[in-house]
Amino acid sequence: MNMRLLLLLLFGSVVMYTSCQSTSALIDSLAARVTENTSKGQILFRLVTDEADPAKDYFEIDSKDGKVLITGNSDLSLATGLNWYLKYVAGIHLSWNNPSQKLPEVLPLPQKKIRQATAMKNRYYLNYCTYSYSMAFWDWERWEKEIDWMAMHGINMPLSITGMEVVWYNLLKRIGYTTEEINEFISGPAFMAWWQMNNLEGWGGPNPDSWYRQQEALQKKIIARMRELGIEPVFPGYAGMVPRNIGEKLGYQIADPGKWCGFPRPAFLSTEDEHFDSFAAMYYEELEKLYGKAKYYSMDPFHEGGNTEGVDLAKAGTSIMGAMKKANPEAVWVMQAWQANPREAMVNTLDSSDLLVLDLYSEKLPQWGDPESMWYREKGFGKHDWLYCMLLNFGGNVGLHGRMEQLVNGYYNACAHVNGKTLRGVGATPEGIENNPVMFELLYELPWREERFSPDEWLQTYLKARYGNDLSPEVAEAWRALEHTVYNAPKNYQGEGTVESLLCARPGFHLDRTSTWGYAKLF
């Protein structure tokens, strides 16, 4: 054999072996955490590529020498396969209510090889609001559990806004703002979501210096673990937000987006202003110094009714995109489809490969082109890629709620629709989490199930995962009742999330709701 060819083969073998070993160690560690150190020697992981169909992610569950063998094309696929095995072979359901569980001494083996694959390469997670309603004061111990949960559900692009206040702190210091002025702009921890969405400024602050140091260190640990697992964090990009006083203080040309729920919004830096490009560049520089470059940047200019008077939307769109591309030419702009966004005038001139739209409320008010939707857009999102997303939760309110049939049927209808040619995956965009885990299991299995299925049939398999293989008839009957009531909200139900408790309403003699937009009557 040619010596050069022999050396090349040997080198390739070493590289492949090292890659498999490092990946195995990484997923072994995850498996140990979620099984309370009982998976070692019982579950084996193997990373391989599928040369026959490289466009798809996949995993296989099999057995070898009396042990469970999980094969996949990436770390995330292996983690997703682990979760699938635990649910559908071992009868173990890991969720927010039960994030880890010891394995039995003798693990059940699959009766035959299980293989699941998906061409839906994007699986998104989180909403800005989640960071305030559910995550405002999480520490690393809690975040580690959540990242494990993400990996086991195949999530590969979660919104990541922890510690972004440090970016703004450093940026504003750089242009001459005092610490006091900065804290008048940056909101307190419980209101970071609405500050990041350009809805308000300063509310709930000021923040102590220790907060900024703590959140910077926490975010660095979060994104390091995500990137180890092949998860791409979605960072907030620069969409024109500036403090309201920047015109008076520094002479910047700004537009006033008005108020949001009575709160004065931060100003919008005009793209006509000579400072726009330099300010955006400084933002991305400070972001990269702290947390590195991102593949995805989330930006939602004029969120929830922001005033666009005097704004050239087309120029704003190209300027925002241009600033992002200067920071990372390979980056993609992620935008929420919510109410008037995305505005056609802002995105029509953008290249199709540069924007990814989140159809934020696909299970109720889809904008992808469903003619039955109140938010119907005939052309959907046009040439741009998009994700089918489940919103589910509003306000972090806790209660049993879901739209199983609409979620499943809507997804497969979208896949079959002409606008489905640009559908690239799914996402969960809840305002609050740690409730209704059944809906998240259902959502994140959709891309791994190529054929349309019945929610009723799926629920029977889910219940065995949740309660074990010895499912009692009483439990099954109770869940059938839930499936056809609270987990099958009718299309004409206009409430935001779960029905409300009248105990939370203002006193009155004829109450039927707590909020003006909600309902207390169960369907």
List each model region and its residues.
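Second-shell loop/turn segments in exported
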Residues: 67-72, 131-137, 209-210
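Contiguous, structured surface segment used for ligand recognition
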Residues: 20-120
